[in-house]
Amino acid sequence: MSDTFAADFLLATYETERLKTLSVWSCFQEADLAFRPAPLARSPREQMVHQCVSEDTWMRNMFGVETGRPALPPAEDRLSFLRHYAECSRARQDALAAKGGAWWCEETAFFDVRRSRAWVFVRRLVHSAHHRGQLTVLLRLLGRPAYSTYGPTADTGGLFANHAPTIYRYESEERLLEAEEHGGDWPELPGPGEKPPTERP
């Protein structure tokens, strides 16, 4: 695998992961942001705070990528989080796109060890995916619709083995931000139908 191919792959993955994060965030209602499912668990608002602060810290300290913006939005409501994360992560995407393929293979500090930037970036992606998964559970507990992140959900049709479709809430960051100003787009979800939506019902 060439350095350029690896860089293009990482950047393309980051772009889709950014949209997935924004899409999950968009499914929460304003009143949901304070929901705490257990005393030691983060609320949705705290997960959004963590995502913004953590990604800002990793990008500045491990990749030297500055956005020129504060880590957090001026107000901690859902629309402000959506706009701010979209803006900051887009700026990071553009800055990373200007780096050459060899840059990704160079080592950087990863807490108390040194790893290649590509290695660290993969950890950043899965770190974000981990917390996004936690938020998806909160959506289910709150009774909110569960659109696809990577594949079918019980709401989009059940199990992949039963030929359930993948239904994303948004196809682009631009449409998401535009629609969320006016209540959002809510594509119809068919539900699981007659077959069980889980493997061991």
Residue ranges and their predicted role:
Residues M1-T13:
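Extreme N-terminal tail/first-helix region
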Residues D3-A6, L40, P74, R78-F81, ...:
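Residue-level recognition of alpha-helical structural elements
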Residues L11-L22, D32-P73, F110-P201:
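Short, contiguous alpha-helical
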Residues K20-S23, C27, A91-A95, Q134:
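Solvent-exposed, charged/polar functional surfaces in cytosolic regulatory/catalytic domains
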Residues C27, H50-V53, E87:
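Residues within well-ordered alpha-helical secondary structure of globular protein domains
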Residues C27-A34, D94-C105, L141-Y147:
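Surface-exposed helix-capping loop/turn segments at secondary-structure junctions
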Residues R60-G101:
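Helix-adjacent hinge/juxtasegments
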